[in-house]
């Protein structure tokens, strides 16, 4: 099991998502628990590595327009949640 760290950017974005009421927080928590357990996400989440300057990061689609950006520190068993939001919010 990975220890989960939330960046300040992630916390701010999550707060906005909660205030919007557009998504169920339980959906986000479910995906984070799967990732933190080290299990592979189901295909429907379209989990993949990013490219270019963000190649150390991964991205998955919690919902079609809700993306989670994260990375692992495998040596210390840490999962860092970097940001969450729509494509236009993140990129």
Predicted regions and their residues:
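Basic, Lys/Arg-enriched alpha-helical interface segments
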Residues: 1-64, 73-79, 88-91
């Amino acid at each position: 099991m990975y220890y989960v760290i939330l960046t300040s950017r992630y916390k701010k974005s999550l707060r906005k998502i909660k205030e919007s009421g557009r998504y169920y927080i339980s959906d986000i928590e479910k995906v984070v628990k799967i990732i933190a357990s080290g299990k592979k996400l189901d295909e429907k989440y379209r989990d993949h590595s990013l490219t270019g300057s963000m190649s150390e990061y991964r991205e998955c689609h919690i919902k079609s327009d809700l993306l989670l950006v994260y990375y692992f520190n495998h040596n210390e068993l840490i999962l860092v949640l970097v940001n969450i939001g729509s494509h236009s919010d993140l990129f």
